[in-house]
Amino acid sequence: MDTIASLFSFITWPVSWVIVQFHTVYGAIFGPDTGWAWGLSIVSLVILIRICLIPLFVKQIKATRGMQTLQPEMKKIQERYKNDKQRQSEEMMKLYKETGTNPLSSCLPILAQSPFFFALYHVLNGIASGDTIGKINQPLLESAQKAHIFGAPLAAKFTDGASKVESLGASLTDVRVITAVMIVLMSASQFFTQRQLMTKNVDTSVKTPFMQQQKMLMYVFPVMFAVFGINFPVGVLVYWLTTNVWTMGQQMYVIRNNPTPGSKAQASYLERLHKSVTEHGRTRRRGEKAIVKAIVAKGRDRNEAERKFINGLNKAGLAAQADGNVVKNDAAVAVQSEDGSTVTTTAQPKRQQPKRQSKSQRQAKPAGETEPKTSLTKSDEPQDAEPAGKQDAKPAAGAKKPAQKSGGGGRSKAQSGQRKGPQRPKSPSKK
């Protein structure tokens, strides 16, 4: 570990300078030789580093989600070129280039803070050995050696012997109890962070090798922390524990406010967002607009939780816009079906359905109602002027016809030897 720390000696001076500046502030409050002054200086160093790494953390989230999305395509490439490793690598790089994904982006925060971690280890190791290093001069060195956190010196390790611990002004029991508790807390925080990531923030609709890797890391990382933690000074354990707690809180914030699409966390988030939007009638924050904008842009590729969210807004008389805003939409209601297609129905007044009548009601006509003429009756034939007496006799003859046809169901029947339908008038020459 000392050899690795020496490789990052170029950053030892900046790290020691930052610690000294924070120690000056906290020393004026708690006293320069107290463990609180030195411990809080290390914690403040962690917070400062992690704030500077927030842009890299955002890039890590995007890269991780991009890798999750590409897992099905990567699996197809591996199966297609399983006997040609070179072609497989070429296709993988081509896929990364087309989608703009960099697999190393997910490791950027860890790689970026590694130099600070080893530089701090180098500084604390110098304090334990009594050597001035970086910005820490002899008076600050003596002050740091006197500082204890819950009875354990900053430079003490779990593996140190009784003589070395006594030279730092502490007992071996106190050092081992404090370091063991910190190692357990460090491993537990790492396990909880990975478990939250696996159970809530992973797309459950796609089973990929990436999920198996994350599940394996959930158990491997805590064991690694426990193994390496016994060789780290108390000050480094404070740094590492603070880093894990920060990561856990940061991950919980991301899971709650910007979850992975298709995960359980996204379903919970969209339920809360739907409740907020229906109460206020709009999206209130920039993050909410970004989520709605991404869902609208997906179109038919929305997952079940996203379709449920869009349909819920439409049923509430709201419509999600392409810019992420939500507006009232009383004219149309769009509902997305299971296959992703959107069906829009316009709100129109209900058409009045005619009252159904039975066969006997249709046949029984009122006495004063005239039966409508059809194309099968003789009334379609051209009529010449006839005497008045003959015209008066026709209604009487026509009045008897309904009684004669009552057994036939009111259906117009053609006479025997006569073709159905309208008849051609007889030629005058045949009369």
UniProtKB/Swiss-Prot annotation:
The record's listing under Pfam families reads: 60KD_IMP (PF02096)
* Biased composition regions of type Low complexity, renumbered to the chain: 394-405
* CDD domains on file: 5TM_YidC_Alb3
Start-end of Basic residues biased regions: 421-431
Membrane-spanning residues: 10-30, 38-58, 220-240
Q: Where in the cell is it found?
A: Cell membrane
Which keywords fit this entry according to its UniProt record? Cell membrane, Chaperone, Membrane, Protein transport, Transmembrane, Transmembrane helix, Transport
> Which protein family is it in?
Belongs to the OXA1/ALB3/YidC family. Type 1 subfamily.
Role according to the record: Required for the insertion and/or proper folding and/or complex formation of integral membrane proteins into the membrane. Involved in integration of membrane proteins that insert both dependently and independently of the Sec translocase complex, as well as at least some lipoproteins. Aids folding of multispanning membrane proteins.
Task: Name the chain's protein.
Answer: Membrane protein insertase YidC
Taxonomic classification, please? Bacteria, Bacillati, Actinomycetota, Actinomycetes, Kitasatosporales
- Give the gene that encodes this protein: yidC
